[in-house]
């Protein structure tokens, strides 16, 4: 099970997540969001993620929302990102055609309203990973796991990362309910008073990796 810790705002939290075995670390590159970080912090986190001690090969994900391809690629290179996450209403066919195919993309789809779009796109875009999340993301809004499980049983070819309302107490339940999920994504569920809680980060990764 892949584990992504998103919305990181400090180098300390990033180092903790790397040391605890996270597969992906997400930084918010959308202007004006509560977890958006400035370039110096982003570069510090990037350095921490790409250090030699990162034996697991944790990847750094930049989260974007309805930004131009030029802006996305500029920050991709500036922050030495490994993965681009598109969390808005982007035309994934267009973005995939303009972003080098070697760069992995995570695309947010809302459930259930984006399911038909997802099915239409599935065979037409390469190196794109599906993320089921709420509209805004990072809100703690829990998705309907039962409904996703039922839909997924009819479309087992669609593997996905699940986000929305996950925390150390419920992540194992979500994983058990969603056999076609290949990853879990957490942000607010490992925070205390809006700040990443390092003990919660560690516990979440442990629970998701069992």
Curated annotation (Swiss-Prot):
Name this polypeptide is given: N-(5'-phosphoribosyl)anthranilate isomerase
Keyword Protein transport: no
Coiled coil ranges: none
Family stated for the protein in its record: Belongs to the TrpF family.
UniProt pathway: Amino-acid biosynthesis; L-tryptophan biosynthesis; L-tryptophan from chorismate: step 3/5
Recorded name of the encoding gene: TRP1
Disulfide bonds: none
Keywords: Amino-acid biosynthesis, Aromatic amino acid biosynthesis, Isomerase, Tryptophan biosynthesis
């Amino acid at each position: 099970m892949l584990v992504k810790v998103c919305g990181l705002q400090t180098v300390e939290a990033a180092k903790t997540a790397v040391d605890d075995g996270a597969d992906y670390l997400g930084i918010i590159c959308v202007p004006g969001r509560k977890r958006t970080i400035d370039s110096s912090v982003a570069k510090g986190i990037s350095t921490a993620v790409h250090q030699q001690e990162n034996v697991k090969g944790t990847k750094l994900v930049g989260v974007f929302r309805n930004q131009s391809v030029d802006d996305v690629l500029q920050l991709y290179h500036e922050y030495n990102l490994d993965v681009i996450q598109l969390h808005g209403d982007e035309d994934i066919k267009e973005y995939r055609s303009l972003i080098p195919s070697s760069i992995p993309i995570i695309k947010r789809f809302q459930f259930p309203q984006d399911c038909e779009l997802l099915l239409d796109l599935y065979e037409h875009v390469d190196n794109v990973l599906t993320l089921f999340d709420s509209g805004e993301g990072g809100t703690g809004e829990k998705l309907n796991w039962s409904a996703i499980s039922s839909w997924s049983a009819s479309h087992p070819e669609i593997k996905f990362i699940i986000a929305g309302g996950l925390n150390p107490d419920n992540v194992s339940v979500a994983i058990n309910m969603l056999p076609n999920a290949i990853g879990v994504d957490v942000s607010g569920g490992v925070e205390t008073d809006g700040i990443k809680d390092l003990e919660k980060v560690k516990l979440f990764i442990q629970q998701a990796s069992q």
